[in-house]
């Protein structure tokens, strides 16, 4: 099993319609830039929250216009540079399948599948007590069989209460009340945990596994390590240290996942000053955990030079 010292987490959630998608991407240059920035591990997107796959898949939906195996090329070139790669799958969000299969979405108490802030990401969430569960298990299984990945990273494991028939029937089977809000919430939580154990069963023993969204205690015995996601520009600088202190009691390794953004995910124009990113790195080191920088890959060009010069400065 690989160990992580300095990592990068690549977010990549890309709407259709980008006509020059991947035109300037070169996987060898990508891996060499990571190596030059002293990176030894990355979380690399196999399926994003829009619902697109970035590899040839018999299960999912490839990004429209993607003409090459983006994930596979990155994996090969990173391995040549000694960099480990986990395959990233967004679980809670899949807007393409939600569009095609409304019956795979969480149904709220008012009978809606679209609710909340329509301008944000979580205006509809996928239900793992639907056909979506097997869909995702099949796609994850496809990747771990097809590629020599070093791990799997599951994201957006959201325990959104679902009042659909499948969840109601499951609650009744467990002698609960499908109209009782705490029972519905507990069903959603247990469904996530059970699904993650199913994914764990697809993986070799030496593979890293992070179910991001489960609590630290829920990950014990399941996860290879815990990643403490904290973008302090928005979340606050007191969030990480409290979680790190608790993580030290779990007897599994931990990683501090900050971001290169001034604010939070999606702050595409934001690049932290060296002192700010350096503070996060020292925060990780002083708490005895590994260090990871969250980034978002440019859909045409790949890694941005300024970002990785900054990461290189801090990791040096």
Which stretches of residues belong to each language-model region?
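Hydrophobic targeting/anchoring helices
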Residues: 45, 150-155, 169-197, 202-316
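The substrate-binding groove and active-site-proximal loops of carbohydrate-active enzymes
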Residues: 9-25, 53-69, 117-139, 177-192, ...
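Catalytic domains of carbohydrate-active enzymes, especially glycoside hydrolases
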Residues: 25-50, 146-147, 280-283, 287
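Aromatic-lined substrate-binding rim segments of carbohydrate-active enzymes
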Residues: 48-93
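Aromatic- and acidic-residue-enriched segments that line the glycan-binding/catalytic groove
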Residues: 54-66, 91-119, 155-180, 227
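Active-site-adjacent "subsite" loops/lids of carbohydrate-active enzymes
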Residues: 71, 87, 91-147, 197
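Loop/turn elements at helix/coil->beta-strand transitions in domains of secreted/extracellular proteins
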Residues: 2-7, 37-42, 79-86, 147-151, ...
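Short, solvent-exposed turn/loop segments enriched in Gly/Ser/Thr/Pro and often Arg
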Residues: 11-13, 43-51, 89-96, 153-164, ...
